[in-house]
Amino acid sequence: DREEMIKNVLNGHGTAAYSVCDKMPWYNEESEVTYDQKSAKALLEEAGWKEGKDGIREKDGVRAEFTVMFNPDDSVRQALAEDFANQCKELGIEVKTEGAGWDVAYDKALSQPLVWGWGAHTPMELYNIYHTGTDSDSAEYSPYANETVDHYMDEALQADTLEDSYDLWKKAQWDGTTGVTQDGDIPWIWFCNVDHLYYVRDGLKVAEQKIHPHGHGWSIVNNVDQWEWSK
């Protein structure tokens, strides 16, 4: 429940996220999914995951449990991990959380879920997290590989213009048969887009902001030439 997560963790200052490129021109709206806990439980039951006495599901002697890592220096990521764990418990899945520094997390991320932060004004973000690495058999930040997805992105990079590449980037996300959305391989789960909050001096009129990239840079002053003081 992304909206509940935004309420609990961000005090409402965020929007639901479904991909690394929400609302960008190359965004595929097929990435969006409706929250439905009842259907999620039904799918688990149908797949043979039955609740044990402690409420955690099991199948063939295997408990539905795993660990999610987060950067201990980032309180927001820790809170997101904890909220995710609480919501999973309602489904009968036990999620343990673990603070891990980047020196450890980068290596473990290929076999263990990690709370990341991404987002930039370029479709290369899709390439960075989903394309198979040059010297490996998986993507750089997750154990993911899909030749069809790779092909779409390779073709997109060869397009004559950025605009000509949009459809190929969208197909890399979902082409009706395969991709990285919830109907495809879904190697990443996207939680939320965090609103950047600032103190503003009385009388200063800040121009309408475009979507801010993840956490870095000077996006707030991207259009400072359009700011003005109230008369």
Residue ranges and their predicted role:
Residues 1-32, 36-39, 76-85, 105-231:
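Detector for C-terminal structural segments
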Residues 48-51, 160:
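Structural motif corresponding to the C-terminal cap of alpha-helices
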Residues 50-121, 196:
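Ligand/substrate-recognition segments at binding pockets and active sites
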